[in-house]
Amino acid sequence: MTRHALRSTAILILAAVATATGTAAAQDRDFAAPPAKPVKLVFIHHSTGEGWLADWGGRLGAALKAKKYFVSDTNYGWGPDGIGDRTDTGHWWLWFRGPKRTTYLNALYKEYEQHCDYTRLAADPGGENTIVMFKSCFPNSHIGGKPNDPPKTGANPLRGQDCGSAYMKVANVKGIYKDLLVYFKSRPDKMFILISSPPLVKGATDAAHAANARAVHNWLVKDWLKGYPHKNVAVFDFYNVLTSNGGNRNKNDVGQTAGNHHRFRNGIIQHIQTVASNYCAYGASGDDSHPTAAGGKKASAEFASLINVWYNAWQASLQKR
């Protein structure tokens, strides 16, 4: 893609976002304010999420503390049946649609502990977790199939499978995420934030699989929630955010106009791509896709700019019910 084409694409994306949200820009500015009192949030993750939360890494824990969110988390080995071990795309069906979902989610909503080290609010405000964040790790960005394959309907062979499954294909991945909306729709009293799977470094994937990952994550942001009736689901494009940097893996491009971003800026939600890359720009090494602290800090800044907008929009929608 040429530089001119990239610039045009970015303008079109911004125009689309502005069209969707521009009439509510003033309202969105109001929605950017922190909650009046602390809100409980639980984050389902593994090693990349741990690094993102950590003070030595992306400092997401500290960023959410500053926004008045009381953060707990799950990690390897957590919960009934050790369900915390299973966080690949196909596993989300087990958590939110499978026969033991009530057991898993009752434990999740009541979780209040830390399962890795990060800064958080000192006082637990009590009650169940209000927000559930969930994220699969970077191997889930190695996706087969074709970029424009539609979501699989009906029985999906990826249900309950790990990311090494032969069924890890675009249609099945999209189908899993569509399946989750059935549960989310049944719980308008909870908020669910999907963190898209982070990108792989170039040495850990190939162009076709990386392009499929880009297509899936664009679909999640633009199409997944079309027609969904509530405001209790959001998606943060962690993948896109980690595909551009400020010159090297230890320097980020947070706050820059150009680059690949998902953030709240100038009164609107921006999801833009001006850098033609489908690979991790912050890999710890040429074959290690764990993001550096610089990448994590960029993601923290951009996510922290969005969460209040999503949360307040959801709360406002509940008042209208």
Which role does the model predict for each range below?
Residues 1-10:
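Bacterial N-terminal signal peptides that target proteins for export
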Residues 9-20:
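Bacterial N-terminal signal peptides
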Residues 27-71, 308-321:
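N-terminal module-boundary/linker segments of secreted carbohydrate-active enzymes
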Residues 37-40, 67-72, 127-132, 186-193, ...:
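Loop/turn elements at helix/coil->beta-strand transitions in domains of secreted/extracellular proteins
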Residues 44-47, 74-80, 134-139, 195-200, ...:
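Active-site-proximal beta-strand/loop segments in catalytic clefts of secreted hydrolases
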Residues 260-321:
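Histidine-centered active-site loop/cap adjacent to the catalytic His
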